[in-house]
């Protein structure tokens, strides 16, 4: 199993996961969001090619409109 820290919570995932696969599990389809991996923003174009490793720290931020 792969242990990731997402928005401060420790979670378990199957091995060989990339950012795009992780995002797909988070019900973010159609939403505007940003992913930070170990302190670095991962561009959307790199989600499918950015592998996740045991112990990685992620912050996933969803943009919320309002006024």
What are these regions (language model features)?
Residues 1-66:
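Ubiquitin-like/PB1-type beta-grasp interaction modules and other compact soluble beta-rich domains
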């Amino acid at each position: 199993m792969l242990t990731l820290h997402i928005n401060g919570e420790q979670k378990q995932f199957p091995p060989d996961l990339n950012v795009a696969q992780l995002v797909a599990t988070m019900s973010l389809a159609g939403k505007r969001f940003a992913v930070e991996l170990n302190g670095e923003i991962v561009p959307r174009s790199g989600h499918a090619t950015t592998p996740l490793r045991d112990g990685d720290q992620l912050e996933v931020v969803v943009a919320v409109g309002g006024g």
